């Protein structure tokens, strides 16, 4: 297998459909056109032609599109054949194309990888293709499209350019210490560094929003049996996703629902009631519940308001609180306010949010929705924006750390060499986002997660 091979893959989903598309990219795309179509179509024009087998018989008839390199998606010669979407027809056509020497089936994401390697896309834009396909909401799709069109990359490149300019001044001061202007001590470097830090903080804030749009928030509903966990899941989902009865221990396994709150994806997980298990099935369910709790972004600690007047989680169930991960955020949800007569709404207690509601009637559930949105810092009024992955956030955080360390070197010891090194490392972190500085291993992991025909 070589990167110089001509590759072919189905670009439409497998199965039956009105249209099926095969995409070919590489040096032999021209030969495929001449062999299967009998001619080379006019560049970038739709040509209605028969698709022929080796014996001259017609396999299908459809649209052929020819994009000679470098003016194509991959930067190579690209041919697209758009025929009927039957799996048998597409399979026959694919087998016909693969009889031509030098062609092979594309790896997942290989078309996008070639576009990146041929400077048609940077890495953030290439990732945005997969994110656009996987978008679960309108806002996520729009943000992915912004990333594909270069919005995120432009912000990152602006930061890289600013750091390059800053490094020039710092390294000039190091290399020419006898010059009249001392760049390190006249305040210019500090002012420029502060500007870059402020710009980076703004990008980090937008990236966190973009990460929420892409990844969503994992919320686990946990508590004792019959506290109303499944009723709350149904109320948040807006449908009867879970069976609700008065029998304690009805929920034996993990139930998952994916919803959106004003565009923010929310992964809600209902778990088995936590208690001493009465049988092996319940024990396994409780064990899975704890596994989900430990991986949550937030836990909704469900409390049956008819069984206790306590509001402090450590007082309600100290053993449960003691077992939770130290930094895991908790929201105490006192349920059954329709029975207890408690005032609906939210308050703060010892660093925890406390919400009183009725999962059965739905009263107070909107307060919980708003709380979940605000607790993650999600901005529904965000204009534009872009999607961000975990690796993007990590690179931005590392760059911010290096800039803060560089600032400390500047203000503390005026150590120009150490400042220059911190600036270089920050620049390297940012360049990893767009692929200007990226390991082959990372590229392999990123593109292998794409669809076959992308």
Curated annotation (Swiss-Prot):
Pfam (any one): TrmE_N
Subcellular location(s) of the protein: Cytoplasm
Classification via InterPro entries: G_TrmE, GTP-bd, GTP-bd_TrmE_N, GTPase_MnmE, MnmE_dom2, MnmE_helical, P-loop_NTPase, Small_GTP-bd
Residues that hold (6S)-5-formyl-5,6,7,8-tetrahydrofolate according to the record: 23, 80, 120, 454
Free-text comment on the cofactor: Binds 1 potassium ion per subunit.
Binding site for K(+): 226, 245, 247, 250
Positions that bind GTP: 226-231, 245-251, 270-273, 335-338, 358-360
UniProt entry keywords in alphabetical sequence: Cytoplasm, GTP-binding, Hydrolase, Magnesium, Metal-binding, Nucleotide-binding, Potassium, tRNA processing
Cofactor: K(+)
Gene Ontology MF, one: GTPase activity
SUPFAM superfamilies found in the cross-reference section: P-loop containing nucleoside triphosphate hydrolases, TrmE connector domain
Sequence positions that bind Mg(2+): 230, 251
EC number: 3.6.-.-
Ranges where the TrmE-type G domain occurs: 216-377
GO cellular component, one term: cytosol
UniProt enzyme class: hydrolase
Family: Belongs to the TRAFAC class TrmE-Era-EngA-EngB-Septin-like GTPase superfamily. TrmE GTPase family.
Function: Exhibits a very high intrinsic GTPase hydrolysis rate. Involved in the addition of a carboxymethylaminomethyl (cmnm) group at the wobble position (U34) of certain tRNAs, forming tRNA-cmnm(5)s(2)U34.
Subunit structure: Homodimer. Heterotetramer of two MnmE and two MnmG subunits.
Protein name: tRNA modification GTPase MnmE
Organism: Escherichia coli O127:H6 (strain E2348/69 / EPEC)
């Amino acid at each position: 297998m070589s990167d110089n091979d001509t590759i072919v893959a189905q670009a439409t989903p497998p199965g039956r459909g009105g249209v099926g598309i095969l995409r070919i990219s590489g040096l032999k795309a021209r030969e495929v056109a001449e062999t299967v179509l009998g001619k080379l179509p006019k560049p970038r024009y739709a040509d209605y032609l028969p698709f022929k087998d080796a014996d001259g018989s017609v396999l299908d008839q459809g649209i052929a599109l020819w994009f000679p390199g470098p003016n194509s998606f991959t930067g190579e010669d690209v041919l697209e054949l758009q025929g009927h979407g039957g799996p048998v027809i597409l399979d026959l056509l694919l087998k016909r194309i693969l009889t031509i020497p030098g062609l092979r089936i594309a790896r997942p994401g290989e078309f996008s990888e070639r576009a990146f390697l041929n400077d048609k896309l940077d890495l953030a834009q290439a990732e945005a293709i997969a994110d656009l396909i996987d978008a679960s909401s309108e806002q996520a799709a729009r943000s992915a499209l912004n990333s594909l069109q270069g919005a995120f990359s432009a912000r990152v490149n602006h930061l890289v350019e600013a750091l390059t300019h800053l490094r020039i001044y710092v390294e000039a001061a190091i290399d020419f210490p006898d010059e009249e202007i001392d760049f390190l001590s006249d305040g210019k470097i500090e002012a420029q560094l502060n500007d870059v830090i402020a710009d980076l903080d703004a990008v980090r804030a937008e990236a966190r929003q973009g990460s929420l749009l892409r990844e969503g928030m994992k919320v686990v509903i946990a508590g004792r049996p019959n506290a109303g966990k499944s009723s709350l899941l149904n109320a948040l989902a807006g449908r009867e996703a879970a069976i609700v009865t008065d029998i304690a221990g009805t929920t034996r396994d993990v139930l998952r629902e994916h919803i959106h709150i004003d565009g923010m994806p929310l992964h809600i997980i209902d778990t088995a009631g936590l208690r001493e298990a009465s049988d092996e099935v319940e024990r396994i369910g409780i064990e899975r519940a704890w596994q989900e709790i430990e991986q949550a972004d937030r836990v909704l600690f469900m409390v049956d308001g008819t069984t206790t007047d306590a509001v402090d989680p450590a007082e309600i169930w100290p053993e449960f609180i003691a077992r939770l991960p130290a930094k895991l955020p908790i929201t105490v949800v006192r349920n059954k306010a329709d029975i207890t007569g408690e005032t609906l709404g939210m308050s703060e207690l010892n660093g925890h949010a406390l919400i009183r509601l009725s999962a059965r009637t739905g009263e107070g559930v909107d307060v919980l929705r708003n709380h979940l949105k605000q607790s993650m810092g999600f901005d529904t009024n965000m204009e534009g924006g872009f999607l961000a992955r975990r690796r993007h956030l990590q690179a931005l955080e590392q760059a911010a750390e290096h800039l803060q360390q560089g600032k400390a070197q500047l203000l503390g010891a005026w150590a120009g060499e150490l400042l220059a090194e911190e600036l270089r490392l920050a620049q390297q972190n940012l360049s990893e986002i767009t692929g200007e500085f990226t390991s082959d291993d990372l590229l392999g992991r990123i593109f292998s997660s794409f669809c076959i025909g992308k």
